Amino acid sequence: MAVHKEVNFVAYLLIVLGMFLYVDAKACTRECGNLGFGICPRSEGSPLNPICINCCSGYKGCNYYNSFGKFICEGESDPKRPNACTFNCDPNIAYSRCPRSQGKSLIYPTGCTTCCTGYKGCYYFGKDGKFVCEGESDEPKANMYPVM
């Protein structure tokens, strides 16, 4: 009987420790950020609803395709330091595919977003337009303390 109690205790302990490892140990503070806007490279457009962009101004990490699905190029512009490109549309590009495809591409206003609560893969800028940080959260965290 004592062996069963020890086994149960060890199993319970492993489950509790596993839960602590699974939970994100990093807690974000409740202060609001002073961010101006955020850019999150996202998939856009489709063969039937093409986008207006060119390879120079397309985001690094995003691939651009024509309406038949043929690869045209990878974006060349780093959201942290955008290229000085013309804003001419490349008529060959119909749509993009980026690693993160959900949510908005431009976050404005940022509300109470901080670098800690912002999405990984999104780039946040101050009100002066200068790069501040990349988001640190794998998933959006609920804002428990909304701006009053």
From Swiss-Prot:
GO terms for CC?
extracellular region
Q: What induces the gene encoding this protein?
A: Mechanical damage (i.e. insect chewing) to this plant results in the systemic release of a factor from the wound site. Within the leaves it induces the cytoplasmic synthesis of proteinase inhibitors I and II.
Annotated GO molecular function terms are: serine-type endopeptidase inhibitor activity
- In this chain's numbering, which residues are marked as the site (Reactive bond for chymotrypsin)? F87, N88
Residue stretches of each sequence repeat: 26-81, 83-141
Transmembrane residue ranges = none
Function, as annotated? Potent inhibitor of both trypsin and chymotrypsin.
Keywords, in A-Z order = Disulfide bond, Protease inhibitor, Repeat, Secreted, Serine protease inhibitor, Signal
Q: What is this protein called?
A: Wound-induced proteinase inhibitor 2
